[in-house]
Every structure is written in C-alpha cells, then in structure tokens.
Amino acid sequence: MPVVESDEKVDDTAKDLSSLGLSDKETARGEEKEEKGTVAAPSAPTVDTVQPTTGPSWPATAPDHPLSKFYDIFEDVIKSAEHNEVYGILLTKENPFQTKLILQKFLRANQNDLDKAKQQLLETLKWRKEFDPVKATGEKFDKTRFGGLGYVLEVQGVPESKNEKDVVTFNIYGAVKDKKATFGDLEGFLRWRVGLMEKSVQKLNLASATTPVPNYGEGPDPYQGFQIHDYLQVSFLRQDPAVKAATSKTIEVLGRYYPETLSRKFFVNVPVIMGWMYTAAKLIVAKETAKKFAVLSYGNQLAGELGVDIPAVYGGTKEDLESVAEGMSLE
C-alpha cells in the first residue's frame, strides 16, 4: 500500500517558501466553492432535521472497515462539537452518501487511523461553528486590502485528470499594495483567505457528488482542487513579520481544517535559486508528498501542468483572472 501523506504535511514541506517575507522595496502578493446545492452552516446541532432522501449509494463496507466504524460513531462527535456542518454538507444518517464522503476524507488524511480522524473532525466542527466559513464566502472585503489577491477558476482539460472540470485557486502575492494593511489585521486576513478557500471547496460540488471517494491507498480523491501561488515581482530577500505571521496561521488553519481538499500546489514565478532549493527538498520527503507540490520559475510553464484552459499569462488561452475567474466580494 503506498504511503499517502496529509495536506497538512504537504503544507509543512512547502512552508519555508510560503512564509518567506516580502521586501519593503517591492510590492507583495497575499497568501494560499459558492455552489448550488450546498447548505448554509446551522446555528445549532441539527442531527435530525434533514428528511430522509433517495440518492447515490456508497459501496458496502465490512463492519470492521474504518469507514463503517466512523459512520457508527460520528453522531457522538457531532453532539460533542454541537455542530454538524462541513463544507456546507450536513452530517446526518439521513444523508449517508455525502456524510460518508466527508468522513472518508478525514480517514484518508489520517491514513485510516480512526482515533486521529475522529479528533480532527471534532476540532474541525468546533472551528467551523466558531469561525463560520460558509458565512465568510458571502462577506464583503476592503478592495484596497484584498483587490486582485485571490481568484477561483474552473478549468477543463487538466492532463491526467478524470474530472470534466477542475477547480484552481490562484493566490497573487504581487497584488498587495500595502503589506501592513493586508496582513497586519490577522483576523481580517484570515476571514478573507478562509472565505476564498471555502468558495473553492464549494466549487467541488460535494453536495451533488455521486462518485465515492476511494479507500485510503486505493486511488485518488476526485474531489480536490489545485492551489497556485504566484510570486511575480516578489522579493525573497527579507522576511516581513506580518506576512510571515499571516502565512503561518493560514497554513495551520487550512492544513488542519480542510483535509483532502488539495490535489497539487504550484509555486510559480519563483526565482531559479529558490527552485533549486525545492528540487533538493523533494529528494528528502516522501514520494507522495513530493508529487503534491511543484516549483515553476516562469508563469507560462503552468499550462504544461494544468492545460491551456487558464489565462494566457500562465501559458493558456483564456483572458486575465479578473475577467474569467471568481474572487471575493469587494467594496
């Protein structure tokens, strides 16, 4: 069985690059889905509020299978957390397919360790109850702080992908005009960044999913997205404390509370010397982890990885991100 590491470990591997500060002499770029059918987060436990429905069926699993065991006890986790929503999906026995899909993601992220998966689900539910990321997707943010920093784009024709469409999130670091304004208010930055992440997850269409997520080690999860970190016009010479703090906290939050949502992560427009460093780093991490991130020195190389259904600046055929992609609401 191949070794598959969690998104949290991938983020740890890439953290040195993501957390490098931005020079005071240059502009910086800010850090790393709304879909019909998703359900807004409930304000209180609603384990029994969803009416039984007919829908897709999950393949039968043996009583001792980790997913069977998790499904038997997840309601206890919900009661403890006093919340039952993940990615806009209500976890209930009346919604077995989508519930098992979410539980399977937590199992895969923890290599089928039920205790660890249970703990991560509990922490995620508590965090979602407090932070309310679904609400964040519809909030308005200051255009002067976050304009041009992040976009979500649906693309077709990704090489080797079996999906009709894939979801790509772009983090445009060079769009930052004022580092202190963008990153200084950490909580404000997190609401923007988590809102963007939640928006991208909604685009995965989990509420209408009909294909089961494979067991850990038995194939790829089809419900994952790509993350792009564009460092054009960004200096790696200095570390800005505010940028470093915001990046570190973002990695912590997304790595812990969004398991199995990352297919691959690309760092583009990275200076050649930094590319060499990451090439060396990939030699000392697990093979499956190394597959999840790539460093590209030039933006137009991205089309070789994701196909041509991306903006021309990345080697594709589409117009610029502002024209073809979706960002957060700004005012």
From Swiss-Prot:
Which Gene Ontology BP annotations are present?
Answer: Golgi to plasma membrane protein transport; regulation of exocytosis
| Molecular-function annotations in GO | metal ion binding; phosphatidylinositol transfer activity
Q: Which compartments does it reside in?
A: Cytoplasm; Endoplasmic reticulum membrane; Microsome membrane
Q: Which domain of life is it from?
A: Eukaryota
Show the InterPro entries listed in the entry. Answer: CRAL-TRIO_dom, CRAL-TRIO_dom_sf, CRAL/TRIO_N_dom, CRAL/TRIO_N_dom_sf, Sfh5
Gene Ontology cellular component? cortical endoplasmic reticulum; cytosol; endoplasmic reticulum membrane; plasma membrane
Q: Where does the CRAL-TRIO domain start and stop, copy by copy?
A: 148-322
Compositional bias segments (type: Basic and acidic residues): 23-37
The topology of this chain with respect to the membrane is: Peripheral membrane protein
Question: For heme, which residues are the binding ones?
Answer: 173, 193, 229, 231, 265
Tell me the first and last residues of the signal peptide.
Answer: none
Instruction: Write out the biased-composition intervals (Polar residues).
Output: 46-56
The record, for Pfam families, names: CRAL_TRIO, CRAL_TRIO_N
State its cofactor. heme b
Residues of the region (Disordered) are: 1-62
What is catalysed by this protein?
a 1,2-diacyl-sn-glycero-3-phospho-(1D-myo-inositol)(in) = a 1,2-diacyl-sn-glycero-3-phospho-(1D-myo-inositol)(out)
Q: Which UniProt keywords apply?
A: Cytoplasm, Endoplasmic reticulum, Heme, Iron, Lipid transport, Membrane, Metal-binding, Microsome, Transport
Under SMART domains, the record lists: SEC14
Tell me its family: Belongs to the SFH5 family.
According to its UniProt entry, the function of this protein is described as:
Non-classical phosphatidylinositol (PtdIns) transfer protein (PITP), which exhibits PtdIns-binding/transfer activity in the absence of detectable PtdCho-binding/transfer activity. Regulates PtdIns(4,5)P2 homeostasis at the plasma membrane. Heme-binding protein that may play a role in organic oxidant-induced stress responses.
Against PANTHER family, the record matches this protein to:
PHOSPHATIDYLINOSITOL TRANSFER PROTEIN SFH5
Task: Tell me the protein's name.
Answer: Phosphatidylinositol transfer protein SFH5
| Gene that this polypeptide is encoded by | SFH5
